């Protein structure tokens, strides 16, 4: 089949494709200090999250240093402990806002050398109560133990359990359950 010159014009003529894009690029953080975050790539979001957590950790009086290499199995060393950092803004909902405590914590691995994992879910741009900026942590040992539970809140990603990939995530309603787990701690317990 030969692609006709007007083919690209024809498939866009009814507006469906263009309208779909417009409906899915809304930024619920517009007008806040997080404006534009949703349009960044995964790498840029990761760097931003690490910078954000570093500033929070320093403000709490903890010592923090970068990982020894960019390929280390952790992002920072906090109080001498290799620490993985996961940061997310609350996920967009269908009304143009966000769903509280619904975020994505992904690319967690059993085989990496982190000892603690800090995760942050930003629910509102300017916090008025402690959990508006939800900040929690858990240990690598607790993560590995929880993975063995039949009702684990973490799921395999990129190939699933049958793919044998050591890559896990927690998202949506499972994040809301995760924050209530006994092994998950607040930053004041760091």
Regions found by a protein language model. Give the residues of each.
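Nucleic-acid endonuclease domains
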Residues: 1-81, 86-190
């Amino acid at each position: 089949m030969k692609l006709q010159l007007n083919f690209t014009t024809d498939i866009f003529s009814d507006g469906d494709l263009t309208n779909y894009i417009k409906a899915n690029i809304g930024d619920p953080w517009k007008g806040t200090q997080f404006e534009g975050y949703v349009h960044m790539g995964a790498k840029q979001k990761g760097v931003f999250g690490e910078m954000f957590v570093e500033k929070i950790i320093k403000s709490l009086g903890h010592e923090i240093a970068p990982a020894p290499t960019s390929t280390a199995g952790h992002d920072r060393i906090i109080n001498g402990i290799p620490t993985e950092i996961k940061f997310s803004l609350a996920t967009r909902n269908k009304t143009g806002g966000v769903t509280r405590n619904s975020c994505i914590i992904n690319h967690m691995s059993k085989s990496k050398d982190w000892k603690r994992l800090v995760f942050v879910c930003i629910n509102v741009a300017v916090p008025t109560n402690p959990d508006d900026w939800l900040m929690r942590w858990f240990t690598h040992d607790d993560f590995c133990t929880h993975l063995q539970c039949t009702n684990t809140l973490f799921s395999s990603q990129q190939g699933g359990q049958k793919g044998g990939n050591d890559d896990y995530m927690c998202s949506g309603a499972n994040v809301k359950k995760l924050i209530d787990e006994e092994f998950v701690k607040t930053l004041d317990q760091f």
